[in-house]
Amino acid sequence: MAAPDLSTNLQEEATCAICLDYFTDPVMTDCGHNFCRECIRRCWGQPEGPYACPECRELSPQRNLRPNRPLAKMAEMARRLHPPSPVPQGVCPAHREPLAAFCGDELRLLCAACERSGEHWAHRVRPLQDAAEDLKAKLEKSLEHLRKQMQDALLFQAQADETCVLWQKMVESQRQNVLGEFERLRRLLAEEEQQLLQRLEEEELEVLPRLREGAAHLGQQSAHLAELIAELEGRCQLPALGLLQDIKDALRRVQDVKLQPPEVVPMELRTVCRVPGLVETLRRFRGDVTLDPDTANPELILSEDRRSVQRGDLRQALPDSPERFDPGPCVLGQERFTSGRHYWEVEVGDRTSWALGVCRENVNRKEKGELSAGNGFWILVFLGSYYNSSERALAPLRDPPRRVGIFLDYEAGHLSFYSATDGSLLFIFPEIPFSGTLRPLFSPLSSSPTPMTICRPKGGSGDTLAPQ
């Protein structure tokens, strides 16, 4: 019988006198008794002492609780040897007594032992039936409120479902609008492309034969002149008799020579490359560009708002810094481009010369060299009625632009120039592998009362650009 007694003693020693269950985090009081930490904390609910031991009633002025780790191991061992039996419904799990009361402060069911423990002395403790009736009334009010909330939630859910369906319909409608509009635009652009190509071909068929006819006529005249020159050169080598024989006929043919110049054919193309709506699209990428006075040639005069520049007749006394262009009559924009798409417009008015474009930030600004792509410049130069660049020879313009749009796509290596007035393409550089930092470049080239003015973006997206 020794083994059962030992097992029973182990259970008794490992059981808390308050909750009558195995110890959980046991602590020891000053009087030497052990309790679960949570049990003694609840039992000593008052904030100030003295504190009475629940077992021997000895008073202690302070909460001196020492962890009892050996007892915790013993309780764990007892728990493994004799697991606590399941607590029947309606029975207190701590004291294994019937639940007969309800604490309104902690909202807990209590047994008689719970009430005697002193933990709930200052709480609102009521019999089960009375507490149940009061809580039932509260629950019914809560149910009424929750049912109203449920009705509102169902209404909101129905509205949300309708909104989702409506939104999907709106998105689908707009999707069809986008597809339809772009398909229409593609057809219009394709038709416009065919019309431009057809007009260009007609213009080629109209002018090219006249140019070839003039070239052929000049070839015939050149051949006739070559024969006559050869004949006269041979006659000059003859003795006197041979030289003078039939000289009258030879001199007559010389006098009859009249060089007929070719027909003057205008070299301006009547067909211009103008894509409907292109400039409006490019303006989505417009930026607010201003001039950098530290880079301006001493002969250039900048406006106070740094948007206009013109060339003066006298040099200004300005610091000769490495950033300043000299002798080239150039000035850079403040903006620096290392990626992305950018568009800006410049009002040139009736100026007879100007240069616009971009350059690398590290270009040589002190040498009077060619502003070519090889030197880090990509610019369009306008001279009277012609424009050129380092990539293309002089080309005539039928209608010189009064406002020029510049579009840069850094990653695509694209730089193009447009007449911002009618949207016609002025020039496009071949694909450029840009690297490093690029900056806008402006040059008036010559003196003129008309300044070059950077247009200021107006309003929000989709608005036009206006000069200052």
UniProtKB/Swiss-Prot annotation:
Localization: Cytoplasm; Nucleus
Organism: Homo sapiens (Human)
InterPro entries: B30.2/SPRY, B30.2/SPRY_sf, Butyrophylin_SPRY, ConA-like_dom_sf, PRY, SPRY_dom, TRIM/RBCC, Znf_B-box
Gene of this entry: TRIM11
Residue intervals of every B box-type zinc finger in the record: 87-128
Reaction(s) this enzyme catalyzes, per UniProt: S-ubiquitinyl-[E2 ubiquitin-conjugating enzyme]-L-cysteine + [acceptor protein]-L-lysine = [E2 ubiquitin-conjugating enzyme]-L-cysteine + N(6)-ubiquitinyl-[acceptor protein]-L-lysine
One Pfam family of this chain: zf-B_box
Pathway in which this enzyme or protein is active: Protein modification; protein ubiquitination
B30.2/SPRY domain: residues covered: 268-461
Protein name: E3 ubiquitin-protein ligase TRIM11
The protein's assembly and partners: Binds cytoplasmic tail of integrin alpha-1. Interacts with the HN peptide. Interacts with PHOX2B. Interacts (when autoubiquitinated) with SQSTM1/p62; promoting AIM2 recruitment to autophagosomes. Interacts with AIM2; promoting its autophagy-dependent degradation.
Enzyme class: transferase
Main location: cytoplasm
GO biological process, one term: regulation of gene expression
Key word Metal-binding present: yes
